[in-house]
Amino acid sequence: MVFRTLDDVDVLGKRVLVRVDFNVPMALGKVCDETRLVRHKETLVELQKRGAKLILLSHCGRPKGKIEPEFSLRPVVSVLEKIINQPVAFAPDCIGSTVQVAVEALQNGDVLLLENVRFYAGEEKNDCSFAGALAHNGDLYVNDAFSVSHRAHASVEGITRLLPSYAGRSLQGELQALEKGLGNPTRPVVALVGGAKVSSKLFVLNHLVEKVDTLVIGGGMANSFLAAQGIHVGKSLCEHTLMETVKKIIKKAQECHCTLLLPVDVVVGFRFEKDAPHRLYDIGDIPEEGMILDIGTRSIVHINSVIDKAATLVWNGPLGVFEMPPFDKGTIAVARHAAERSLTGRLVSIAGGGDTVFALNHADVANDFTYLSTAGGAFLEWMEGKVLPGILALMQP
């Protein structure tokens, strides 16, 4: 994948519209988590040092095309100033005369944050006139937000038809890391897919069996794969209406010479709650009243042995109900094993998705993986093999 970056453009004195993702959690008008802001530091500091006039575009929350004060980006200003060690001006709108006046006042190296682009319905509709109003205040455009690049929105895709467009450093780093995962990986490649439902990851599973050497299935979706092979799963979460679909995925994996790895033993609980009574069972012995809530000890050993032989690991989704101890043990054990191999340079590990990030933080290994994507929907669509609208616009002709 070849795309245009900041190395390909002179930004001195240029009005640079930068699409960032400042969709951060807030409480009582204060930012609660700075993680997403920090991810943009490299791009913003570089542009500032190179003498660009920075105009930042972002959404926050889901205001549905109207002004909702609780979704204002104003609280971001003071936090961002500390992160980039630079004053940040704020415009109470993202288009119109107020913004134009603020942009005209910018000097080289200045930073201006515009108000939430989703206060206008034209943003999510990818309206060309709204995209034009955004583009009016810039000479060129930089996308630094992989997490929104699956959205064909005005500030992500529409604007790229109107201005020369480039990838920022955060986006560039993410794309290069993901390329190591599935684009041009070192083999053998293992994908570990967990989570509750097969239905939410059908496209992911169908794509992965074509791309990886081993596909490990965990979490609630493993129950559907077990059931499709005639294994009784008791009261476990299971999508019985998808049995034929699951069988087709199993068949496709065989045709693509992709090894499918399912649990061989499981932790069964008898109530769906923290510290519920539980026992370890082989998959052929699951009691009628039981629910599969985690993978068992032999399954952990099997998965870790597959990871030992892998050069690349792509992970999305927990292996059990990790938010309810003690049913987090499987996820923690495998995560720590993968992290240890990553730290010693024996494994390239790429992980992403909201629950996955939470699970790896819970296991205290999030910083030990080769790359951890905080993008949710964008990461899943990448795993499906889709070319994201916001990325397509940056690719070299």
Curated annotation (Swiss-Prot):
What UniProt keywords are attached to this protein's entry? Answer: ATP-binding, Cytoplasm, Glycolysis, Kinase, Nucleotide-binding, Transferase
Which pathway is this protein engaged in?
Carbohydrate degradation; glycolysis; pyruvate from D-glyceraldehyde 3-phosphate: step 2/5
Q: Where does substrate bind?
A: 21-23, 36, 59-62, 118, 151
E.C. code: 2.7.2.3
The record lists the organism as: Bartonella tribocorum (strain CIP 105476 / IBS 506)
Q: What is this protein called?
A: Phosphoglycerate kinase
Query: Which residues are listed for ATP binding in this entry?
Result: 201, 323, 353-356
Mind naming one GO cellular-component term on file for this protein?
cytosol
* BP GO annotations: gluconeogenesis; glycolytic process
Disulfide bridge partners, by residue number: none
Origin organism lineage: Bacteria, Pseudomonadati, Pseudomonadota, Alphaproteobacteria, Hyphomicrobiales
Where does the protein end up?
Answer: Cytoplasm
Tell me the first and last residues of the signal peptide.
none
UniProt family annotation: Belongs to the phosphoglycerate kinase family.
